[in-house]
Amino acid sequence: MEQHELFDVTVIGGGPAGLYSTFYSGLREMKTKVIEYQPELGGKIHVYPEKMIWDVGGLTPITGAKLMEQLVEQALTFSPTVVLNEKVESITRNEEGIFVLNGSSGELHYSKSVIVAIGSGILNPQKLEIEGAERFEVTNLHYTVKSFKQFKDKTIIISGGGNSAVDWANELEPIAKKVYLTYRKEELGGHGQEAQATKLLESSVECFFQSSITKLIANGERDEIATVELTNHETGEVSCLVVDDVVISHGYEQDATLLENSELSIERVDNYYIAGNATSESSIEGLYAAGDILTYEGKINLIAGAFQDAANAVNKAKQFIQPDAAKVAMVSSHNEMFKKRNKELVKQLVGK
């Protein structure tokens, strides 16, 4: 019989929920693997590396990039196996009750338990549906804002009206020469962003509602966008704006193929989210979920909430593979696993 390396738990997804699941499973002395589709860990935080995050308990305002750096460092504490550039395409279960994860590389991953932490899915931004638009992606057509500095003193148009579009417009307004925003609806969208929307509408950002980008006109000398054509869907009026950069914020496609292709009958909500409970259990014994992919009554869709989901998922996974295990891990301040590490940290502090 062919032997395969078997893990106690495999975490699918390397965002905040997946990273904390990875750390906490190491804390519970579980042999852990984390699989991430992107070439690096961090998840959706890569979309807003310079955005300030205020709502993580115990942390003063921190940039997305810094939080991501710290989450990754924490996740690697107990030396888990990390697999990057791998998409888990389906989950099955063999005759021995072991989960078999089918990777896009052709590799099969074997695990006693699984934690699904794929958030809103693989990050595939919805592209601008204009013929030839893709050729500008190497110059001045952007689907995320990774550095505000690159837009300093430039004229920018942002297409979109959701949370990210509004946030980017507000962040860029003080440093850019001019910011335009075009949105296909009558008013800004987003959830819980009323204050940010009001701030934008009262700023120098010039908004074009019920309008969309219908044409990108290139610079004759260089292969980059020089002018954007906007069309008002109500009046049919066409206007042209001279710009330096175009930012598209039309959301992300939800890739539900992992759950759709799996032979396991995982109960879902809205044909995507995993239906679970407050202790991160799914309808499949041994398979748990954490973060935005998990839904239950009273769910908190915050990074802080993802951490609680992760700890619950790991605790349940631990008891699933070892029924006599403690329900929860020993708190870090009294945990013997950190004794040696704490001594080293104290030495470093005293040395300073």
Predicted regions and their residues:
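FAD-binding core/adjacent interface of flavoenzyme oxidoreductases
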Residues: 1-12, 27-28, 40, 81-154, ...
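Beta1-alpha1 glycine-rich phosphate/pyrophosphate-binding loop at the start
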Residues: 7-80, 166-191
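Glycine/Thr-rich phosphate-binding loops of Rossmann-like dinucleotide-binding domains
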Residues: 43, 124-125, 131, 167, ...
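A Rossmann-like FAD-binding core segment of flavoenzymes
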Residues: 75-103, 108-111, 173-272, 325-332
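FAD-site-proximal beta/loop scaffold in flavoenzymes
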Residues: 129, 133-152, 245, 249-304, ...
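A conserved FAD-binding loop/helix module that cradles the flavin
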Residues: 168, 293-336
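C-terminal auxiliary extensions adjacent to catalytic cores
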Residues: 347-352
